Amino acid sequence: MAEELKNDYKISFRGDQGRVAHEFIIDLNEIKKTTGITEEDVAKRLMDYGFHAPTMSWPLVGGLMIEPTESEDKAELDRMIEALKKIRQEIRDVETGKADRTNNMLKNAPHTLRRLMSDKWNYPYTREQAAYPANWIHLRGKVFPTVARIDSAFGDRNLICSCPDVSDYTQGYDDTISMKV
């Protein structure tokens, strides 16, 4: 995957032979400087393509760790490569002025069903471009995010559990163990 993407993104932490391990890091720091597009923007846009957002800013601040699992087949890896290449083109559209620096598919990602189905659509791109940026998404399907953006850093520092009290999980539970010998 890193070889397929090397002309589109800076790949960090290559070995002496120019190879990467089973995961690789896309360095978005230069893109961030020139366009304002962040690693979070790219991660959120991947959700519009139907992919789980990758690890952000670890081990490289401003990077994305792409770590496909062994259970992914070649077709799925190829779709992710295509998604990342299409996202790179969306970034180029910002670089060239074809897309606005603040009101674009990356800055507004992910696109929730609620937003897509709203009567109000004040974006310079179509709902189709937002929700189905690649043709194969119609066939493959995807899970739409239910929440667009949150303040991730605030949430990380101010975690509040909204779970029921632990005692709610133990009501009606018989903790005796019966063993037949």
Per-range role (PLM):
Residues 2-181:
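Non-catalytic terminal extensions of PLP-dependent enzymes
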